[in-house]
């Protein structure tokens, strides 16, 4: 039983979205894990809470002697864990109609190619009708 390998075929639906990088969002990400924003090159600086913090992060040659910059590689916090290897290169598709049924697309709000019903237009006739013309008998 030690050599028995199971192979699973999973179907996942990925819904991608765009998140605005507002200060509140960046502060939330920074509080979760400060290493997330370090490689994004956003220029996000944590707001100083007291006067020591205000001068601690200044990187100017006028305020301190320049030290040797260490370019040590950052350690991956998840390197000791083993996750699944999933290859999505051939199967990832944005064409949902081909893979999913209409009922499922309706449930998540994607309605397919049907157009909405036309709106009915009514005119409010508050004035009296114009009198009919008399016809001459020819």
UniProtKB/Swiss-Prot annotation:
Annotated GO CC locations: viral capsid
Coiled coil start-end: none
Keyword annotations: Capsid protein, Host-virus interaction, Late protein, Viral attachment to host cell, Virion, Virus entry into host cell
Biased amino acid composition, Basic residues: 129-138
The keyword Lipid metabolism belongs to this UniProt entry's keyword annotation: no
Iron-sulfur listed as a keyword: no
A biological-process GO annotation: virion attachment to host cell
InterPro entries: Capsid_L1_Papillomavir (IPR002210), Capsid_L1_sf_Papillomavir (IPR036973), dsDNA_vir_gr_I_capsid (IPR011222)
Principal subcellular localisation of the protein: virion
UniProt-annotated stretches for the region Disordered: 111-138
SUPFAM superfamilies associated with the record: Group I dsDNA viruses (SSF88648)
Top-level taxon in the UniProt lineage: Viruses
Subcellular localization: Virion
GO MF annotations, alphabetized: structural molecule activity
Pfam families registered for this protein in UniProt: Late_protein_L1 (PF00500)
Family classification: Belongs to the papillomaviridae L1 protein family.
Quaternary structure and partners: Self-assembles into homopentamers. The capsid has an icosahedral symmetry and consists of 72 capsomers, with each capsomer being a pentamer of L1. Interacts with the minor capsid protein L2; this interaction is necessary for viral genome encapsidation.
Functional note: Forms an icosahedral capsid with a T=7 symmetry and about 55 nm diameter. The capsid is composed of 72 pentamers linked to each other by disulfide bonds and associated with L2 proteins. The capsid encapsulates the genomic DNA, but does not bind DNA. Essential for the initial attachment to the host cell.
Name this protein carries in UniProt: Major capsid protein L1
